[in-house]
């Protein structure tokens, strides 16, 4: 679900970035609505979204996860502590819904992996 054309870089409905074969891109659609639409009509194995943050988006993520769909999503923040200060996101990370948190920066170029944290094992795999 590419609400702001940040994942596939779509232009006139065509992905400009290689997001893989057998990938459908729903662009310029609010994430909460897009998630519900693809759940009802596409039977996805995985849903990827750009950054989440509001209660409607988080509710849609719970619906997808409860339906057995795997998720890859982003959250913007300065640190894990910054993100955990946001009530909605803290609930997501405190639950058993996500397994890993990957902290990225642009230190060595966009997408530099700084840290990987396993939420279930409560340990850092990389970076600490």
What is the predicted role of each segment?
Residues 1-38:
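P-loop NTPase switch/communication element
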Residues 5, 29, 53, 107-108:
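A broadly conserved detector of short glycine/acidic/proline-rich loop/turn motifs that flank catalytic sites
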Residues 17-20, 91-93, 120-124:
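Short, low-complexity, polar/charged sequence segments that are solvent-exposed and flexible
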Residues 99-128:
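Conserved P-loop NTPase
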Residues 2, 50-51, 118:
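Acidic side chains
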Residues 7-10, 81-83, 109-113:
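Switch/connector loops and helix/strand junctions flanking conserved nucleotide-binding motifs
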Residues 16, 42-44, 48-102, 106:
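Conserved P-loop NTPase nucleotide-binding/switch module
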